[in-house]
Amino acid sequence: MSGRNVESHMERNEKVVVNNSGHADVKKQQQQVEHTEFTHTEVKAPLIHPAPPIISTGAAGLAEEIVGQGFTASAARISGGTAEVHLQPSAAMTEEARRDQERYRQEQESIAKQQEREMEKKTEAYRKTAEAEAEKIRKELEKQHARDVEFRKDLIESTIDRQKREVDLEAKMAKRELDREGQLAKEALERSRLATNVEVNFDSAAGHTVSGGTTVSTSDKMEIKRN
């Protein structure tokens, strides 16, 4: 006993490939696949030999009881072929690709212009802020310069006043020294001792007479002066 089953199947697949650059070189591929299947089965009648009944257990024994002996089967054979067909893009697809490129270019220009406007705004804001800060710094420097001038003026005036006071003090001390020297000289003059020697000689007929004396005068004077 034999059986044969032949099955033929044809499959057609189309695929469109678009280049990433978006240009008009669009390719269309057509793939045709043919499948052929073949199955062959041959069965031989089993030979019957009388034998005592035997009970088979397990999967192998059960399969042998169901199928019996002499069963063979051939595997399926599959074959196929592939064919590629290159097609040129249509006018509509070319126009669509051109419009896509134009839209991409316009959007890119719009992004660049928007970024340029934002940078101009930021630059202008930064310039105004920098000018305001520079004006503040200039005014602070002017104030600092005025403070420096005032400080130098105060320092010079303070130095002049100190020198004047030192000169006045030195003159006062010199005057007091002169006053003390004059006072000492005056006191020395007043305390000087006056000495007088007197000697008298008297000659007469009766005889010779000598008379003498010494006078010492001391004067002390104290003067208190209040300033």
From Swiss-Prot:
Residues 95-194 are annotated as: Helical. Residues 205-219 have a biased composition (Low complexity). It is found in: Cytoplasm. The keyword Coiled coil applies. The keyword Coiled coil applies. At high concentrations, the monomers successively form oligomers, long fibers and eventually a gel-like matrix in a strongly temperature-dependent manner. It may be that under adverse environmental conditions, such as low temperatures, the gel-like intracellular matrix can sequester soluble proteins in their native state, maintaining their functional form until environmental conditions become more favourable. CAHS proteins contain 2 repeats of 19-mer peptides designated as CAHS-motifs that comprise each two octapeptides connected by a tripeptide. CAHS proteins are cytosolic heat soluble proteins that seem to contribute to the anhydrobiosis in tardigrades, but their specific mechanisms are yet to be identified. It is possible that protection during anhydrobiosis might occur via the stabilization of vitrifying small molecules such as sugars, but not via the direct glass transition of CAHS proteins themselves. This is Cytosolic-abundant heat soluble protein 94063.
